[in-house]
Amino acid sequence: PLDTADVIYVNAGVTHVVDAWLDGLADGGRLIVPLTTDSNTRSLSSMQLSGLYFKIERRGSQFDARALLPTAIIAAEAMRDPVAEAALAAAFSKGGWNQVTRLVRGTSVPDEQCWLRGDGWSLTGPATSTPAAVPPDP
């Protein structure tokens, strides 16, 4: 477990948010995390969105979220999951990342509000199309 922190900055591209990061945030604390696919390191000439920095801010037991800016950054090889990466690539392709307003833990988010569904978490906003989903661990 992490000590409680006001800021956690992830300095390499990952495919998913980790519970320990969320658990380690103090109330009002911020997590800055680049969610990326592997295409950001394959070709600099590609114009397809392949990574975004997100700011996740703890508000008691809730988490505000918003996309900050596109990124192409070195990947954290140990923090990559092929299924999560495919869901993230699908979410980038469908757009709507600029409407993300919350990170919700658990699986209770209706599909129409979910931009990206991870294993035990979702990035959500106003009603969107069907989410890109990461299936739960077996």
Task: For each feature predicted by the language model, list its residue ranges.
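A short acidic, Gly/Pro-enriched loop at the edge of an enzyme's catalytic core
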Residues: P1-I8, T15-H16
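Helix-to-beta-strand junctions that scaffold the AdoMet/dcAdoMet cofactor pocket
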Residues: L25-A26
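Glycine-centered, small-residue-biased loops immediately flanking beta-strands
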Residues: G29
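SAM/dcSAM-binding transferase cores
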Residues: S39-P138
